[in-house]
Amino acid sequence: MNRSRSATWVKLMAGTAVLSLSLAACGSDDSGESGGDTSPSASESDSSQETLTNDKCAGGTTSADTFKVGGILPLTGNLAFLGPPEIAGVGLAVSEINAAGGVDGADACYQMEDSGDSTDMSVSTASAGTLVSAKPSVVIGAASSSVSLNFVDTLTDAKITQVSPANTAVDLSGYDPFYFRTAPPDTIQGNALGTLITSDGYQRVAFIVFNDTYGTGLRNYTQETIEANGGEVVYGAKGDGDEFPAGQTTFSAEVTAALNAKPDAIVVLAFDESTPIIKELDAQGWDMSKTYFTDGNLSDYSDSFDPGLLEGAQGTLPGNDPDEGFKDRLISWYDTAEGETLKDFSYGAESYDAVILAALAAVKGGSTESTTVQQNYAAVSGATDGEECTTYADCVALLEDGKEIRYAGPSGIGPINKQNDPSSAFIGIYSYNSDNVPEISSVVEGAPAS
């Protein structure tokens, strides 16, 4: 599972667009199969003029007669702010698959279960067991790498295909033939973050990082790039033992130790712990414009801090910045399904593409069984150098003509490689404005070296 740690970079675009995120936890009692409305509801999408449906699975459906999408996504816990866009991506994909005629004659539906977070693994353990019994065609999730590592064996041992839209831990590269992801490994984001920091002229870097697979893995690859570019890590380096446990709430000692190392930039690698860390950094006089965040905490802090506190701080987020048409479709579906306005798009495109690729794999293989999805997943992503197509309907038409395809969806990822990772992916570079809201400033594309 060890991968080469270098990456090749191409600057693609620059501009400004507000990334609006919410830290509010999202829990829904009717997101799963039980107790949910099994009758689709619909609304008209202003952007696409299509009828959107909320296609939850009815009781008793399995992959034998339905393209059944299971989900283990954060409805609760310290990554719950990622739940709405990921669920919207799954739901929109299922809706559009059904609008295009389903999967090889079968209807599509989804069953959503809670992943919780790494502070209580019993939640994801129970959800994985529930979905094994439900016999889905594919399971989308989890958001957290640590959470996926907790239950991935439960799914793969049952020959159920798992696709994460947000896992970045390098430990998951090539983990199992039944595990895929549409998010890039930390080799890519770490290279982007380390390059950003040193390009900004900073050479002495401190990491305030939690002891989590995601945090330590991304720290390691960011540190490697910083050091390769002539910088040094003065606090929180790999092997120094400065990590704090997930769920910690006070950070006076960690911030004091980091500042005593006299860094000229600080990277915060945490989830919900980031808010008290920011407060402590500010209380001890740190210049917050020299602070860097990542996908786990690159959030809208407009309701958390005084205006201007984070202005100039920067961060990275895996994924392309989707076009407005796709965002409008996500917003419309979420309003249809949840009656709420979607404000966060993080990993929405990756979740959507994860489902579309799975459905296309089922079409190519002629079955909605999960083993068929696994056998054809990489091929429909372009691993067999097929003809490019950008919608489910267009890709199905090519498959029905006997052609190989390369689905190119809104996430912008390259074909799935032999490690079941994207062969290339985008990383967004963001900067905080005076309202403490991150705005996209540029996008880079990276690919792990072979």
Descriptions of predicted regions:
Residues 21-25:
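C-terminal motif of bacterial Sec signal peptides marking the signal peptidase cleavage site
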Residues 33-34, 55, 81-88, 100-173, ...:
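Beta-alpha junction/loop-to-helix N-cap segments that form part of ligand/metal-binding clefts
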Residues 118-129, 134, 169-284, 321-325:
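Extracellular/periplasmic Venus flytrap/periplasmic-binding protein
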Residues 281-355, 362-368, 445-448:
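Extracellular/periplasmic periplasmic-binding protein-like sensory domains
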